[in-house]
From Swiss-Prot:
Its EC number is 3.-.-.-. Disulfide bonds: none annotated. It is an enzyme of class 3 (hydrolase). This is mRNA-decapping enzyme subunit 2. One of its GO terms (cellular component) is cytoplasm. A motif (Nudix box) lies at residues 134-155. It is found in: Cytoplasm, P-body. The gene is DCP2. Residues 611-624, 833-855 have a biased composition (Low complexity). It holds the Pfam family DCP2. InterPro entries: DCP2_BoxA, DCP2_BoxA_sf, Dcp2_NUDIX, NUDIX_hydrolase-like_dom_sf, NUDIX_hydrolase_CS, NUDIX_hydrolase_dom.
Length: 880
């Protein structure tokens, strides 16, 4: 048993205690620490702190000594430690005190979370309150010194609170003070000093009360009084920033609530919800059904069985796995299980090698399917290449899984591709599908590259205005022999229908692409020859057409100019079958003698006898072509030449052509007459060549629909009309046409031969927005309409029904037809206007005033159309 050790300083004297401190802190220090008086005195200070902190507490009988007294006792006790004999210790202590005041001090002004309280400390040897602070050490950073001093004095770590740019710096008495501003320190923290005999008290003080009473107290708040103003400004600024942040956060929250953003219901992605619904519905799909005749033979899941495991992993990997997408969403093509007389088959053996990460086991695949016994007739065969294993009944209980919902392995594998496809469908709008792209490409290839046989056959079939024009200048699709056997079935059947027109190309194509000047144009020549003879002087002015109104007015001034010895060349940009012929084509082919007679002023055209038919002109013009048309072509050309032109004029260019089976001919004529005339070009006195915009805006028609339109007009002349329809037709003819409201600029009007036109018609062309000053009375219209109604009520004669059968074999030797006489009547109207309007040229007439109402703009055109219609009906009803 040993005696307890006692503290050696318990009963020592002051001299023994000071000797111990001299040995500890002064004599054994490095020589460089004793190089100057200040450094040596720092070691004296450390010894004094040890005496106060430890020795004095161990031996309370020892006296309390401050630094000056302690330094005087040490120097007097051991004079060798004081190397500077010429330096008075008292003077050295004063110098050391000044040096200590020059050492920078780093501290922190600590505020709570609400910035209304500040933390202050009180020293043991001082009666004033100040910030926790301390002197900076050698080569120490300011922030590190602040953190260290605060940790020593109050025991709180400011590493996560202090900011380098938030501080207040002052120089007081030659000493630099840098106090960092810290906020957000918890007020309930238990502060405790880490050093001895240095900090006596630590308290939270109300900052606003302190700022108001700090100047009244006498030195109770050291260093705080000199920094209270900047501290107040910083606190106000921080509160303002904090208030703005709170206001912004509050406003953002309120705005989100109003807009419904940020709520839990809207946080979920609707697309993801939809995908989850689809995946859950696919995952919980009904059990697979195996049947030979699609009968609903359900698979029982009450007593699930297991499939025998594969023998080894290497053996299962040797089998080539089947693609998981091959059976996605479809029943597996496996027979009913088990099959009598056959070995056990593992239908899902391919899943083990390719999808081992999906299922729990690697050596076996379990399923909850209970395959029914083989009661239905067996129709399906086992999957070729499947591995056959013997039945191992002893392993069923070991691998029997719990009851789980039926899930197909292929469905689990295919969820990701289906989700990606659904996302692509949701992101990308669906593009319109082209149903029969091959048909359009085939037609475009036929139109762009016509064969020589098609080009040759185009000359043998006469062309009409309603036919669909091909890619070449004057050829028509009616003349091309399209092999429907090479086309798709839907295309071949649609081309065979009589009431369906197939637009083979866009009418907006350029004229340069549509013109082939070196091709023979037999059908076009036949049509042009008949048109030149029938229409007379109007065709001679087609070479002068210009798209501007100034040229149109100049043509009106030079109405007496003659164009003798000039053949007809259509140079307009119209895409119709009459205007696709180029000037080069007209010059290259041998031209026959022009059958045009230009009438001078006052001269009239001698009418031909009714016995002369228009077949002579048609056959003569067709004789110049490479082939002579057959008798059937001539007869069809006689019927199509006038009837088709009349139907084209009567029908509105803005409305699509109705089907023959849907509307009767009488109803079609009534609907046409009921429509307001949109422009003056619908007048019958102006031929189809003058209406430049008709063919550009209206779709082209096939030869099948053209023949149907010809038969429509023949049936109209043959069949008697109903009483209601005749009355409606009479009301239409007696009523003046209403203004269509369409204002047509003069710059878009084509050039019209004003010298040989009616005066009111020329005035209407020059001023399309104003009515003519001289209105034609409605008496002629009423009389003509009554006569038209009387003709329509009469039943068609037998000779009229047999008109197309009386065509002679040789059309060259026959006189002109009734169509020529009808055109002569039109020419007489052009050359010899009525006496009520024969008062001068259009230039001599006073121009219509702009203040007049345009309600009677097309009265003259309607009267002329009715007169020409009556003339055609009279001649067609006359028995030869």
């Amino acid at each position: 048993m040993s005696l307890p050790l006692r503290n050696p300083l318990d009963s020592v004297s002051l001299e023994r205690a000071l000797e111990d401190l001299i040995v500890r802190f002064i004599i054994n220090v490095p020589p460089e620490d004793l190089a100057t008086v200040e450094r040596e005195l720092f070691h004296f200070e450390e010894a004094q702190w040890f005496y106060t902190d430890f020795v004095k507490l161990t031996n309370p009988h020892l006296p309390n000594m401050k630094f000056k007294t302690f330094a005087s006792y040490v120097i007097s006790l051991c004079p060798l430690v004081w190397k500077w004999q010429d330096v008075n210790p008292e003077e050295a202590l004063q110098k050391f005190s000044k040096y200590k005041k020059s050492i920078p001090v780093r501290g922190a002004a600590i505020f709570n979370e609400t910035l209304n309280k500040i933390l202050l400390v009180k020293g043991t040897e001082s009666d004033s309150w100040s910030f926790p602070r301390g002197k900076i050490s050698k080569d120490e950073d300011d922030v590190d010194c602040c953190i260290r001093e605060v940790m020593e004095e109050i025991g709180f770590d400011l590493t996560n609170y202090v900011l380098e740019d938030q501080y207040i710096e002052r120089n007081i008495g030659g000493k630099n003070y840098k106090i960092y501003l810290v906020k957000g320190v918890p007020q309930d923290f238990a502060f405790k000093p880490q050093v001895r005999n240095e900090i006596e008290k630590i308290e939270w003080r109300d900052f606003w009360k302190l700022s108001r009473s700090i100047h009244k107290s006498n030195n109770k708040f050291y260093l705080v009084s000199s920094m209270v103003k900047p501290l107040s400004l910083w606190v106000k600024k921080q509160k303002q920033i904090q208030g703005e942040e709170q206001l912004k956060q509050y406003a953002e929250e309120q705005l989100k609530l109003l807009l419904g953003i940020g709520t839990q219901e809207e946080a979920a992605d609707p697309g993801r919800d939809l995908l989850n619904m689809l995946q859950s519905s696919v995952g919980q799909k009904k059990p697979l059904v195996f049947s030979d005749d699609e009968s609903q033979a359900s698979i029982s899941t009450s007593a699930p069985t297991t499939v025998p495991p594969a023998p080894s992993t290497a053996n299962s990997q040797s089998v080539q796995p089947i693609a998981a997408g091959a059976y996605a969403g479809y029943p597996f093509p496996f027979p009913q299980y088990p099959i009598p007389g056959m070995q056990t088959i593992n239908p899902f053996q391919f899943v083990q090698s390719s999808h081992q990460g999906v299922f729990a086991t690697h050596s076996t695949f379990t399923t909850s399917h209970q395959y029914p016994q083989a009661q239905a007739p067996q129709t399906q065969q086992p999957v070729p290449g499947a591995v056959v294993y013997p039945v191992q009944s002893q392993l069923q209980q070991a691998y029997q899984p719990p009851h789980t919902p039926v899930v197909k392995p292929s469905v689990i594998e295919d969820r990701a591709p289906h989700s990606k496809q659904l996302l692509e469908l949701l992101k990308n709008p669906r593009k319109p599908e082209v149903e029969d792209e091959s048909t359009a490409k085939t037609l475009l290839k036929l139109l762009k590259n016509p064969t020589k046989e098609n080009r040759t056959s185009a000359n043998t079939v006469p062309s009409s205005k309603g036919a669909v024009s091909g890619p070449s200048g004057g050829r028509s699709i009616s003349g091309q022999s399209i092999d429907t056997a090479n086309l798709p079935s839907g295309m071949a059947s649609s081309m065979g229908a009589k009431s369906t027109a197939i637009p083979l190309y866009s009418p907006r194509s350029s004229l340069s692409e549509m013109t082939l000047p070196d091709e023979p144009l037999g059908g076009y020549e036949e049509f042009e020859s008949s048109s030149e003879e029938e229409q007379g002087e109007e065709l001679a002015y087609m070479n002068l057409q210009e798209p501007t109104s100034s040229v149109m007015e100049s043509n009106a001034k030079v109405e007496n100019n003659t164009l003798d010895n000039i053949s007809h060349v259509d140079t307009s940009g119209n895409l119709s079958t009459r205007s696709l012929q180029s000037e080069k084509t007209e010059k290259s082919k041998p031209t026959a003698k022009p059958k045009i007679k230009l009438l001078k002023r006052g001269e009239t055209l001698t009418p031909l006898t009714p016995s002369i038919s228009s077949q002579t002109a048609t056959s003569e013009s067709s004789a110049a072509g490479p082939t002579v048309p057959s008798e059937k072509d001539v007869s069809s050309r006689i019927q199509n030449s006038q009837g088709n032109e009349l139907l084209d004029v009567l029908k509105s260019k803005a409305q699509p052509e109705p089907s023959v089976a849907s509307t009767s001919p009488a109803k079609e004529l009534l609907n046409t007459l009921n429509k307001p005339q949109g422009s003056v070009y619908q007048n019958l006195l102006f031929g189809a060549n003058h209406r430049k915009s008709d063919d550009e805006s209206s779709p082209r028609h096939s030869p099948v629909s053209q023949q149907a339109r010809t038969h429509e007009f023949l049936n109209l002349l043959k069949r008697p009309q109903a009483k209601a329809e005749n009355e409606e037709l009479q009301s239409v003819l007696l009523t003046p046409p209403a203004n269509s409201g369409m204002v047509q600029n003069s710059s878009t009007l084509p050039n019209i031969p004003y010298g040989n036109l009616h005066q009111d018609q020329a005035a209407a062309l020059l001023f399309p927005q104003q009515p003519p000053q001289f209105q034609q009375p409605y008496a002629a219209t009423n009389t003509n309409s009554k006569e038209l109604l009387a003709i329509l009520r009469k039943p068609a004669s037998n000779q009229q029904k047999q008109l197309h059968e009386q065509t002679p074999a040789n059309p060259v030797d026959q006189p002109t037809t009734l169509a020529s006489e009808q055109q002569n009547l039109v020419k007489q109207q052009i050359s010899n206007p009525s006496q009520s309007l024969q008062q001068g040229t259009p230039l001599q007439q006073p121009q219509p005033q702009h203040t007049q109402s345009p309600s009677n703009l097309h009265v003259t055109g309607n009267t002329a159309a009715a007169q020409e219609l009556l003339g055609m009906l009279r001649k067609s009803r006359v028995v030869p």
